[in-house]
């Protein structure tokens, strides 16, 4: 697997996981997670706003 290049201030437990399964069932790399987490949080905040 390719080494992920998370920023140093990214949560350690997320960085160490590196590759995770997303709820959509597809394999996500670190780069995907960085984009999916803010999108998910933004969607949730928009729903509750």
Swiss-Prot record:
Look up the domain of life of the source. Answer: Eukaryota
The protein's job, in short, is:
Beta-galactoside specific lectin. Has a hemagglutinating activity on erythrocytes.
**Is Glycoprotein among the key words of this record?**
yes
Q: What PTMs does it carry? A: Glycosylated.
Subunit structure, interactors included: Homooligomer.
A GO molecular function assigned to this protein is: carbohydrate binding
Q: What is this protein called?
A: Agglutinin-1
Q: Which UniProt keywords apply?
A: Glycoprotein, Hemagglutinin, Lectin
């Amino acid at each position: 697997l390719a080494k992920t290049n998370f920023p140093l201030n990214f949560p350690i437990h997320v960085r160490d996981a590196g590759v995770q399964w997303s709820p959509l069932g597809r394999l996500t790399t670190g780069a995907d997670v960085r984009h999916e987490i803010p999108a998910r949080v933004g969607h949730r905040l928009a729903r509750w706003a």
